Amino acid sequence: MTPEPLDPAIPAETVYEHAGGDVGLRAIVSSFYDSIFEDPLLQPVFGHPVATHVDHLTAFLAEEFGGPARYTDELGGFPKIVSVHRGRKITEPQRQRFVELFMAGVDRASFADDLPFRKTVKSAIEFGTRIAIVNSNATTDDELHPQRVIPHWRW
């Protein structure tokens, strides 16, 4: 029995590898992060710059996109991300602005013309921000989103 050929439209590499690993993801996250403190919708959510935020978001995305599981193994995993968002009361306009600014960071990191990558990243960010909005507004554990582990995003 021979295996079916791979779909040539789907890259063989992980999204993490396609992004350039930690270096590429850090470029995206840094570009995004630099923009949020000037934004009137997002600045109230983020407050002031935190030295570890770029590292933590990079590690989260690396794991989500098929890279090493550092966020889970070293930084507290999904329970940590839930605790970070709890009580922030993120609104739908803030969620949408987060996605918009994140995708602008993707573009500034030289992925503006990479439509499959942009589509995959946007889908992951949309999904994650929808979870964040639920968790940030939950007043009890029963109101938290049912997602309890970092999702693994593929093409």
Report the location of each language-model feature:
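Short, solvent-exposed beta-strand/turn "edge" segments of beta-rich domains on protein surfaces
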Residues: H18-V23
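Heme-based O2/NO sensor domains and their adjacent alpha-helical segments
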Residues: T2-E13, R26-D107, F111-D114, R118-N137, ...
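Extracellular secretome segments
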Residues: I133, D142-H145, P151-R154
